[in-house]
Amino acid sequence: MNILNEILENKKREISTMNHFALDNKKYPKYDLLKALSTKNLSFIAEIKLKSPSEGDIFPGADIIQIAKDYQNAGASAISVLTDKKFFGGSLEFLSKVKTNISIPVIQKDFIID
């Protein structure tokens, strides 16, 4: 089985057992992604990814809040947070923590299947 098929099968199992209201109901500040990326200055989206299928662990035990703050302080226009647990070491909890601790747009990055 190739890695994409493995990811697909894992995501199907994950979805079948997940609570469809998994995200908390907190009200987070909203930041305009289009506006953040439309400045005359350099715009970029930084990514928080703790591991990958090809490289394994990239940043084991990393402090994701500090990483997000460092990205924001370095001038990132937005931050992408991988939320796939098995293959990328992410979680919805990471997404929530990042959104709570920075003041730029945050993007959830995960696999979408249909």
What are these regions (language model features)?
Residues M1-S103:
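Conserved N-terminal beta1-alpha1 strand-loop-helix module at the mouth
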Residues S103-D114:
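Conserved anion-binding
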